[in-house]
């Protein structure tokens, strides 16, 4: 497996003495070079002594030497400066386009490294590297967690940047879409994003002093004021409900005025959803947040602490929704505020990523730092991923930790991408007597 040979070379997970070219010259690897992930030789600017002479240049690596010709390197001038060709099997001499014959060295993946790598790929245990975790140094774990946390924010920044583009460059609109998406709390996330992109905020702004009109705007665009969206057993009661009919009438007026097109209500999911998370309630909460002018990016940027963010995003519902979860069915009265846990999730999944993305966009380090500060202030999330890492011995204390470990599982463990993981490196390095 060529990828594994690359890895062994890059990290020097092979005996560093007794190395020789196929024609018997001693080889000393001083610097394996810079790994190239684009077109051209695999490693740039390597430093290798061959027969006592120091060479600085490129190194190419293959499973078999004949892959050189299979990949047509003999016709590519980019390979003229290869100072060493490394392969696990040397079955032919190789030649550059210039007519030179680069020295070749056979490099075998140490048996223990190969066995441990195959174990990582094939084991049913999860995570595959669980045995080594208790022995990892705190410094190594902290360093890797910090990198993963940043990587996760960078990944979310890409999604936010795309939303900004979709919103014609408006960061305010992109923030509203991100906030709304995370009001879906996973199950309805896609539906909420679709809905939020159908909300013309400039048009809504003309009616922001009228909460009922905002609810009509928001619920109408969600398709939830369509009678067909109401379960049949509640339809007649809803049609006799003065608040529902008033909202429906108001939305029809707004739809005509602004040329609105509602989304298909079938996109909303209700199965196995707690009533508190029904889209009606979440949209009612967002309506109130918008009405009180607490759903804007400018207000968020003024918050310098988690406490201030909680106060900003704390929301409630109108009297009608205190006794309803859907139209047409009355329920016991409850305030239906956003819970502390839900607020924390909004800070983790909306606030921190938006601050980080906006800070990078504006080259304003204070917002990026604030994003990290908020994640380090909040306690770790409680979910099956966090519990798994705790069970194998990792300390998970802050939201920054839990976000890092979610990134680790989704982007490395689930993809079996152990060769890019620092824990995977420790696992493979520990399987060899070589300390790279």
At which residue positions do the language-model features occur?
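N-terminal "leader" segments that precede or initiate the main folded domain
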Residues: 1-7
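Extended, acidic-biased charged interface segments
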Residues: 118-172
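Acidic, carboxylate-rich catalytic segments that either coordinate divalent cations
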Residues: 391-436
């Amino acid at each position: 497996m060529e990828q594994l040979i690359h890895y062994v070379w890059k990290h020097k997970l092979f005996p560093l003495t007794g190395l020789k070219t196929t024609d018997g010259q001693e080889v000393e690897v001083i610097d394996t070079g810079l790994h190239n992930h684009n077109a051209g030789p695999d490693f740039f600017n390597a430093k290798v002594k061959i027969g006592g002479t120091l060479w600085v240049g490129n190194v190419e690596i293959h499973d078999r030497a004949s892959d050189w010709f299979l990949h047509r390197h003999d016709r590519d001038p980019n390979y003229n400066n290869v100072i060493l060709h490394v392969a696990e099997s040397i079955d032919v001499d190789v030649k550059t386009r210039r007519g030179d014959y680069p020295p070749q060295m056979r490099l075998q993946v140490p048996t223990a490294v190969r066995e441990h790598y195959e174990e990582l790929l094939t084991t049913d245990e999860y995570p595959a590297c669980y045995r080594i975790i208790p022995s990892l140094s705190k410094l190594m774990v902290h360093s890797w967690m910090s990198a993963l946390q940043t990587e996760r924010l960078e990944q979310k920044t890409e999604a936010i940047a795309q939303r900004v583009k979709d919103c014609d460059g408006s960061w305010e609109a992109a923030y509203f879409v991100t906030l709304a998406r995370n009001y879906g709390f996973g199950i309805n996330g896609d539906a909420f994003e679709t809905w939020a992109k159908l909300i013309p905020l400039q048009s809504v702004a003309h009616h922001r002093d009228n909460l009922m009109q905002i609810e009509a705007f928001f619920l109408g665009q969600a398709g939830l004021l369509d009678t067909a969206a109401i379960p049949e057993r509640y339809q007649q009661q809803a049609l006799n409900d003065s608040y529902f009919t008033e909202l429906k009438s108001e939305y029809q007026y707004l739809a005509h005025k602004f040329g609105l097109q509602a989304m298909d209500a079938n996109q909303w999911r209700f199965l196995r959803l707690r009533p508190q998370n029904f889209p009606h309630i979440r949209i009612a909460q967002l309506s109130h947040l918008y009405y009180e002018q607490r759903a804007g990016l400018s207000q968020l940027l003024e918050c310098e602490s988690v406490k201030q963010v909680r106060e900003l995003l704390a929301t409630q519902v109108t009297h009608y929704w205190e006794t309803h979860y859907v139209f047409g069915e009355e329920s016991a009265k409850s305030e239906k505020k956003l819970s502390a846990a839900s607020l924390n999730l909004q800070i983790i999944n909306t606030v921190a990523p938006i601050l980080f993305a906006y800070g990078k966009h504006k080259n304003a380090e204070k917002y990026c730092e604030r994003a990290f500060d908020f994640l380090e202030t909040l306690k770790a999330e409680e979910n099956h991923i966090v519990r798994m890492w705790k069970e194998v011995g990792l300390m998970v204390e802050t939201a920054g930790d839990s976000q890092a470990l979610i990134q680790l599982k989704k982007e490395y463990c689930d993809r079996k991408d152990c060769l890019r993981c620092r824990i995977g490196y420790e696992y493979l390095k520990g399987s060899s007597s070589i300390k790279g």
